A protein has these predicted regions:
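Bacterial N-terminal signal peptides
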Residues: 7-16
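Positively charged n-region of N-terminal signal peptides that target proteins for export
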Residues: 1-5, 20
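A beta-strand edge to alpha-helix "cap/lid" segment located at domain peripheries
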Residues: 21-50, 55-148
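Intrinsically disordered, low-complexity repeat segments enriched in small/polar residues
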Residues: 5-6, 39
């Protein structure tokens, strides 16, 4: 009976530790996403280059491309992510992969024209060693803005 009770206690403590680690990873991803929006606004391609995985994919309304093209577009101002008003964020951790969903209104300058669009943005992060790398960033334009 003692062994059973001890096993149950150790299992519960292990589950609590796993939950705490997961909550910590979720907060780390939320913070990283927030920093990413600021770096994109600032056109900080050095920080973004460290964050983006070399094989990352970026899906926009106008097409999809890889890391080098995304960094070139940001640096040149082809797309200037001026401000992301974030309304909702959710994070799901699956092993060494984090999937973050943002519901945002994005103020951007595209080809010299300033536009604001509602998006559901999917960010996929992969844990490599001690750091997270962005593996995918996809913008899905929403047809209507959900009620707050």
């Amino acid at each position: 009976m003692k062994n059973l009770l001890l096993g149950l206690i150790l299992t519960l403590l292990g589950a609590q530790g796993a939950f705490a680690q997961n909550a910590s990873a979720e907060q780390e991803i939320r913070n990283l996403s927030q920093e990413k929006w600021q770096w994109m606004s600032d056109k900080n391609v050095d920080e973004l280059g460290n964050l983006f995985h070399e094989k990352a994919v970026f899906v926009h309304m106008g097409g999809s491309w890889g890391t080098k093209q995304e960094l070139d577009i940001i640096e040149s101002g082809g797309i200037w992510y001026k401000k992301a008003d974030i309304h909702e964020v959710s994070v799901n951790i699956i092993d060494d992969t984090a999937i973050l969903l943002n519901r945002i209104d994005l103020l951007a300058e595209v080809g010299g024209n300033e536009v604001t669009n509602p998006f559901e943005v999917t960010e996929v992060y992969v844990k490599q060693g001690d750091s997270w790398k962005l593996g995918s960033l996809s913008f899905t334009r929403l047809l209507s803005r959900p009620e707050e």
